[in-house]
C-alpha cells in the first residue's frame, strides 16, 4: 500500500517481532530510539509510500532513563551528596543519552537502506500535547531534534549539509505560538531551523481541531491526511491506519488538449475522473484478500494491526479504517492555459472563476 501512521506507541509499549525475534519494551531512551529506527526500516521495506511517527511516544523512555540514573546515583552515593548534586549528575547523564538517542534516529534513517533501495521516507511529528504526562521530556526531545537538524549531517567531504530525512512537522498550539506561552522557545528554535534547513513544516493545532473533529495528528509521510475514524469503543484512532493508494490527475494536460474550450475541458475532466476512479478501485481490489503473512511487521506485529497469522486484511480496507486518494496537479498552469491570464490576477474575472471552479 501507499503510506501510513505507524502505531509506534503500541509497538514500543507492547513489543514487536522482527526477523522472527521478539523485541520487548525498551528500558531506556537510547534503546527506544534504536528500536524505533529498526521498525521504520522494516515498515518502509514493505510499502511504497511514506510513514510518520509521533515523537511523543519517546517521552516515557526518557523518563525511564532519568529514573534509572537517579536510582544508580542514590545507591552509589547514598546521603553523601546533596539533592542538587545528585540531580546535576543525573541530568548530565540524561543529556548525553538524549543527544546520542536523537543522533541515532538521524543517522540511522539517513544511512539505512530499505529493500526498495532507498532511505525510508519518514516524517517525525513534533507535537506537545498539554495533557501529556511526559510533556517536559518531549519538549527536551523536540529541542534536541531541532538543534541537531540545524547542525546538519556531514557529507563525504566533511561539510555539514541538510539531511533529506526525516522530514519534520512542528505543531503550533496555544502554548508555543509566540504569545507568551511556556514553549515559545521551541517555536523560535523551529523558525531558526526552517530558515537554515527548510524544515520543519508547520501545522496549526487550532485549524486541525476545526477540520478533524477536535483531533491533531500527522500527515502520512509527506502530505496525505487520514479522515476521522472511531473504533468499537467510540475512541478516535489515527495511528495504525493507512492509505491504500493514490492516483493523481494531470490538469494541465487536459487544458492543453482543450485549447481554451471550457466545454471540452469539463467533458475531458469527467472522462479522466472516471478513469482515475477505475484505477483506484483496481488498487483497492488488488489489496482485498491479502493475508497478514505478506508483511508481518504491518499486519501481525503492530505497525498497522495485530492480526493472526494468514488472516485476511480485508476488514482494514473497508468502513473508513483506511483511505484511498485522488490527487491533482497544475491548477495555476491550467488556469493560465484556459484563460491566458495568471490566476493570481484577481481583477480578471474569468481567471478567478476558472480557478475557483477547479
Could you describe each region identified by the protein language model?
Residues 1-317, 329, 353:
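Catalytic alpha/beta active-site cores
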Residues 333-341:
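Well-ordered alpha-helical scaffold segments within catalytic/enzyme domains
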Residues 317-318, 342-346:
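Short, surface-exposed loop/turn segments at secondary-structure junctions
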Residues 347-354:
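Conserved small/polar residues in nucleotide/adenosyl-binding loops
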Residues 320-333:
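Conserved phosphate/anionic-ligand binding catalytic regions in large, soluble enzymes, centered on
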Amino acid at each position: 500500500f501507499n503510506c501510513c501512521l505507524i502505531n509506534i506507541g503500541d509497538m514500543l509499549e507492547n513489543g514487536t517481532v522482527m526477523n522472527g525475534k521478539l523485541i520487548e519494551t525498551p528500558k531506556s531512551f537510547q534503546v527506544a530510539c534504536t528500536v524505533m529506527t529498526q521498525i521504520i526500516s522494516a515498515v518502509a521495506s514493505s510499502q511504497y509510500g511514506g510513514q510518520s511517527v509521533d515523537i511523543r511516544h519517546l517521552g516515557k523512555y526518557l523518563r525511564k532513563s532519568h529514573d534509572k540514573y537517579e536510582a544508580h546515583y542514590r545507591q552509589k552515593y547514598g546521603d553523601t551528596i546533596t539533592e542538587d548534586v545528585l540531580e546535576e549528575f543525573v541530568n548530565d547523564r540524561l543529556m548525553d543519552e538524549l543527544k546520542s538517542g536523537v543522533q541515532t534516529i538521524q543517522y540511522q534513517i539517513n544511512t539505512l537502506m530499505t529493500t526498495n533501495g532507498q532511505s525510508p521516507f519518514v516524517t517525525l511529528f513534533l507535537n506537545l500535547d498539554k495533557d501529556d504526562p511526559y510533556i517536559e521530556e518531549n519538549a527536551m526531545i523536540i529541542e534536541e531534534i531541532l538543534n541537531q537538524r540545524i547542525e546538519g549531517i556531514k557529507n563525504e567531504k566533511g561539510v555539514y549539509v541538510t539531511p533529506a530525512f526525516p522530514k519534520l512537522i512542528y505543531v503550533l498550539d496555544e502554548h508555543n505560538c509566540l504569545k507568551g506561552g511556556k514553549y515559545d522557545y521551541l517555536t523560535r528554535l523551529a523558525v531558526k531551523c526552517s530558515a537554515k534547513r527548510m524544515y520543519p513544516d508547520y501545522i496549526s493545532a487550532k485549524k486541525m481541531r476545526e477540520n478533524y473533529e477536535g483531533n491533531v495528528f500527522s500527515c502520512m509521510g509527506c502530505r496525505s491526511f487520514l479522515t476521522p475514524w472511531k473504533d468499537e469503543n467510540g475512541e478516535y484512532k489515527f495511528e495504525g491506519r493507512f492509505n491504500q493508494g493514490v492516483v493523481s490527475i494531470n490538469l494541465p494536460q487536459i487544458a492543453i488538449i482543450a485549447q481554451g474550450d471550457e466545454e471540452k475541458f469539463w467533458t475531458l475532466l469527467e472522462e479522466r475522473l472516471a478513469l482515475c476512479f477505475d484505477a483506484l478501485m483496481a488498487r483497492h481490489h488488488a489489496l482485498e484478500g491479502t493475508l497478514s503473512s505478506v508483511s508481518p511487521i504491518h499486519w501481525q506485529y503492530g505497525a498497522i494491526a495485530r492480526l493472526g497469522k494468514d488472516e485476511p486484511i480485508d476488514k482494514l480496507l473497508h468502513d473508513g479504517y483506511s483511505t484511498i486518494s485522488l490527487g491533482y496537479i497544475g491548477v495555476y498552469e491550467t488556469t493560465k492555459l484556459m484563460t491566458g491570464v495568471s490566476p493570481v490576477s484577481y481583477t480578471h474575472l474569468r481567471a478567478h472563476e476558472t480557478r475557483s471552479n477547479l
